[in-house]
Amino acid sequence: MENKINELKAKNLDLEKLINYQDGSVVSREILKLPTGTLTVFAFDAGQGLSEHTAPFDATVYILDGEAEAQISGQVNLVKKGELIIMPAGQPHSLKAQKRFKMLLIMIRS
């Protein structure tokens, strides 16, 4: 895994093209992993999602393609391509794909 991550360093990356949709699935690819945080791209097929959970750190989601339904502490937010949403630490949140979408997840541990 470390070699694959190193291959991406010091290069221009088209994040949307780093990952492909897969029918009926959620696909992820970690592009940076450090003790201080991670960058991961995801592709969600329609009808897929991440169930409600909490995280010990803020989770920032940037939509690369499509649109996501992000629920945070019971409030539903529609997040579209080019937009981001910060899911606060300790608050229950989930993601759902009404249509396909791709996202970048930025986790900073602090």
What do the predicted segments below correspond to?
Residues 25, 39-55:
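Conserved short histidine dyad/triad with adjacent acidic residue
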Residues 35, 64-65, 80-81, 99:
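A cytosolic small-molecule/anion-sensing beta-strand core signal
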Residues 57-69:
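Glycine- and acidic-residue-biased ligand/ion/polar-headgroup-sensing regions
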Residues 89-110:
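Ligand-binding loop in jelly-roll beta-barrel domains
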